């Protein structure tokens, strides 16, 4: 029986993560630490004896760069890769590019907290987590999952909120449950799935 392997990894630290800015669909690259995190992710996957048949990523540089560095570490630089905006980070709209402390000063700490941590309240001109899930989930179900179930060993390098969409369906989490889930930068999560697409095992390679 072929292995139903799905590995998710959030991009390494970006320049705007470091500066405490809302990033969303803005396109900063990785910091030196982010590069190191991505390479380390590749080394960890290699140490677990993993290789892949296909990869998916977003249309944003920080996720694509993370994927490239991981594949280089695995010795798979030419792996077939699909890039799609469905896997892009949540669009923070008018908050994009703002320092998080400055945003709190402008709109108030409580309002910014609602935009960041509620499930269905978007910031001005942006997306809620629910909106992000509405584009990421169909892409997962239609484009990623069928290959996994057919034995394609699959790697997804994306963003905290788009990966939350995949984790929500994989782990059958409620909106409240997924809001509490924090994803560290550059840390692979290894899922092995059953034939019915539910999770057989999960291994988080943190540390």
UniProtKB/Swiss-Prot annotation:
PROSITE patterns, per database record: PG_MUTASE
Q: Which keywords, in A-to-Z order, does the entry hold?
A: Gluconeogenesis, Glycolysis, Isomerase
Amino-acid positions noted as binding substrate in the UniProt annotation, renumbered to this chain: 10-17, 23-24, 62, 89-92, 100, 116-117, 160-161
Q: Does the keyword Transcription regulation apply?
A: no
- What pathway does this protein act in? Carbohydrate degradation; glycolysis; pyruvate from D-glyceraldehyde 3-phosphate: step 3/5
Marked site (Transition state stabilizer) residue numbers: 159
Source domain of life: Bacteria
Q: Name one GO molecular function term.
A: phosphoglycerate mutase activity
List the active site: 11, 89
**What is the role of this chain?**
Catalyzes the interconversion of 2-phosphoglycerate and 3-phosphoglycerate.
Q: What is this protein called?
A: 2,3-bisphosphoglycerate-dependent phosphoglycerate mutase
As recorded in Swiss-Prot or TrEMBL, the protein's gene is named gpmA
